[in-house]
């Protein structure tokens, strides 16, 4: 009966079959699960202070705290930001 009454509900429940073994999260695609697993493994590590990040762009932003690089600036006041 549920299959005919609420087919979307059943389909959505059937799709959620990629579970994280480290926590209770469940994903609808293997790619989404792989991206999530990076939050546990933190593969991007800073060579200077050894702080770890899940995404490379987060590490790149962090490295600017060591280098002092400020690549972004305000068009109005010209103040620079990391």
UniProtKB/Swiss-Prot annotation:
Cellular-component GO terms for this entry: nucleus
The keyword Manganese appears for this protein: no
UniProt-annotated location(s): Nucleus
A single MF term (Gene Ontology): DNA-binding transcription factor activity, RNA polymerase II-specific
Zinc finger intervals, C2H2-type: 1-5, 18-40, 44-66, 72-82
SMART domains named among the record's database cross-references: ZnF_C2H2
Pfam families membership: zf-C2H2
Keyword Ion transport included in the entry's annotation: no
Gene3D superfamilies recorded: Classic Zinc Finger (3.30.160.60)
Keywords from the UniProt entry: DNA-binding, Metal-binding, Nucleus, Repeat, Zinc, Zinc-finger
Family affiliation: Belongs to the snail C2H2-type zinc-finger protein family.
Protein name: Escargot/snail protein homolog
């Amino acid at each position: 009966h549920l299959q005919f009454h609420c087919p979307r509900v059943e389909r959505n429940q059937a799709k959620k079959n990629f579970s994280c073994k480290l926590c209770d999260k469940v994903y609808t695609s293997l790619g989404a699960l792989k991206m999530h697993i990076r939050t546990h493994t933190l593969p991007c590590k800073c060579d200077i202070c050894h702080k770890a990040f899940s995404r490379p762009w987060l590490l790149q932003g962090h490295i600017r705290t060591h280098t002092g690089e400020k690549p972004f600036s305000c068009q109005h006041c010209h103040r620079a930001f990391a």
